Structure formats: C-alpha cells, structure tokens
Amino acid sequence: MEFVEFEQLVGPAEYAPSPVDWNLLESRLGLRLPRDYRQLFQRYPNLQIDKFLGIFAPNSDVDEQLRLIDDAMEPLRELAGVQVALIDDNGEEAMVPRFPFYPEPGGLLDWGATENGDRCLWLTENEDSEKWPIIITDGIQYWRYDGNIISFVGGLLDRAIICPIFPRRFPSSSRIDQFAVEA
C-alpha cells in the first residue's frame, strides 16, 4: 500500500498533527526514522486501527518522547532472557537470541501498542531505516514483518497480513480513528 492509498482510507486530518522537530528528534535518537512514519505524522495525529492498534505520533517535546520510548521498552527489557520465542506466520516458535533494545545498536524501537499491551516496534538493525523490519511482541513471543508501517497496516486491513500475536478476528473492520492527546 502506498501512502496516497492510506490517506484515502483515513480521510482528511481531523486534528492538527503535533508539531515535531524531526531533525532534533532524529539527532537525539541517533537514528533517521522511516519516511512513511514521518509522512504519517506530518499529516495526522495519533491513529487507532479498529479500536485496537494504536500508532502514536512523536511528542513535540523531544526529552519527553525519549522518556516515553524508554518507559515503553522497560517491561520488555525485564522480560527478555538470553533467548526469545520468534514465531512465524503460522505461530510456529523458534528460540533465537534476544533482540537488542534501543539505544543499543540495532535495537528495538517503539512506535505503537495494542489494547492488549502488545508492543509494535522497529528492529533498527540496518542503517537504512526504510529497511527496518517491524517486530510485534506480547513480551513473550515476537513476530517479524519485513515492510513499513503503511504496508503493514494496509495488509492488516485487507487481511493479507495476519499477525499471530494479534487476536484472530483483528481487524473486524477497516475503521481508523484519529485522536489527539492533550499536552
């Protein structure tokens, strides 16, 4: 799915996106964020897919954003052992070395969450952020998708992608809500 197609699904912005100093944020992160993510939140506020999957805009306060990322990652750091269970599209499990966590080089970086507490992450293993895979985890099992956020969400909505960590019936609709968070 291309960004233009995604915009047609979501419709016009209902709220102004948060003003984000992308250069400052990326400088402080030490990472260039994926283009589709920047496009998404230059156009929209936070998004929620089928009242379940939240995709969060960066906070305009960069220090606060870095704290939010760290807070989101802390439970995963505590749960991860030396190995983690990586599952395939059929739910088959293989034990693999645990993923590093941001700010470790190539670490997992948070971009969203579900109502069940699952985390949506990038694996920042490549210098080219356009090649970062998406990792979905419930804290115990991890699942990998090789593609960007727009293609991931588009694939979920048309049921071309089934994430085995998400409920089987998700999504039950193609509803995408926009919401702003009060500062």
PLM regions with names:
Residues 116-119, 141:
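Short acidic/polar mixed-charge low-complexity motifs
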Residues 131-137:
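Short polybasic amphipathic segments
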Residues 119-126:
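Short, surface-exposed beta-strand/loop micro-motifs that present aromatic residues
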Residues 61, 127-131:
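Short, solvent-exposed loop/turn segments that connect beta-strands within catalytic domains
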